[in-house]
Amino acid sequence: MPLHERCFASVASSFTRGRLERGTIVPLRVELKPFERIVIGEAVLVNSGTRISFLIDGEAPILRERDTINAETANTPAKRLYLCVQTMYLKNDIPRYRTAYQGFLRELRETNPGARVTIDAANAHVATGALYKALKEIRKLVKREDELLAA
């Protein structure tokens, strides 16, 4: 059975029972606008024209391009930490980047002591391997830095 049929079959059979069973992984439905990009692991998928929708079955690190930061734009403490965690997430390799992460974390704590709760929440997510959740927390700090720099 092709992948897309398996995805629809697994979702349909789960919902016909009225609920998702514990431990069932539901495929991720992704919609892309024309020419929008999405990063899956180390690959970038580019929508070539019309609006599309597809399912991703399995576990893979996924980020929309608008949620990524590159080395050139990582010019603040929060952005440097975000880039480091983003790299850990997309490459699925926490140990390799742990030393850099700890340095960026220390820098952010020193420059932004008022954000301790958010920084600690992000750090707790990294400690448990929940890197996507850590990115969501760090995004709050990036947004706050951008607001302060714009003022």
Predicted segments with their positions:
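Terminal leader/tail segments of proteins
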Residues: 2-151
